[in-house]
Amino acid sequence: MSTDTDRIRALNDQLRRHLTGGKAVMTHGVAALGSEAVQRLVQTIAIFDDFCTANDPHGEHDFGSFEFEGAPIMFKIDYYDRDLNFHSPNPADPAVTERVLTIMLAEEY
């Protein structure tokens, strides 16, 4: 792994585990699960560790999918510039990157 990949993975893990270092959004379908279920779902994403070459080919921990209380769930982390207009010029550099964690039902992808 490159140093950039290690840094990107660490920043993604920070967002996923602690909801710091970026923003988190959810789809309407996830919101419809209710606030208590969403809290449990966020906790499940925080401890998610089933990363493998099939769902994490670049080793960045930027995607995951699993079943949550009978619902197929996906999460992904995207890298934008600080104005959220374009892709980040360097996802390993938090000074130029805004991370966005999106939580969705698989059917909403």
State each model region's role:
Residues 63-109:
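Short, compact, well-ordered microdomains
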Residues 2-67:
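Compact soluble domain cores
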